């Protein structure tokens, strides 16, 4: 079971249709995206990586299995891009990383999504808990890195 499938299982258990991931380390872990300025939506209908036009080519290269969404195409608004993804995917209850979302950003997103009858629910440590337990591949890669460093 890969990390996205694990996240989907957790979402299902919490009654969520999808999750909006904003913490840079979590975005990288779940998508493979190596840079900053990106956000991820995971839901059963698909995986989305939101970034701007400077990074879409990089995102397409590093994030197979993700639809890359250029937020510049949505009035240069990340919340509007998120709203579009939720509408497209049929998300009615969206989790978000409450510890990594500013109140200002929450209010802006909540205003848009609530107008579409989409509920936002704060989540904690969904991706972090996956990051704590290392897969065999992650352990092997760490060993290789240690050998190279020696």
Indicate residue ranges for each PLM-predicted region.
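Glycine-rich nucleotide phosphate-binding loop and flanking beta-alpha elements
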Residues: 27-28, 57, 102
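Short, hinge-like loop/turn segments at secondary-structure boundaries
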Residues: 36-39, 66-67, 112-113, 138-140
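Terminal domain-start leader segments
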Residues: 1-48, 79, 84-90, 111, ...
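Structural motif
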Residues: 22-24, 51-53, 72, 96-101
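Flexible, acidic/His-enriched mid-domain "rim/lid" segments that flank
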Residues: 77-150
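Short amphipathic alpha-helical segments
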Residues: 32-33, 61-62, 106-110
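Conserved beta-strand termini and adjacent loop/short-helix elements that scaffold enzyme active sites
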Residues: 21-22, 69-73, 121-125
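Compact, glycine/acidic-enriched structural inserts
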Residues: 52-80, 84
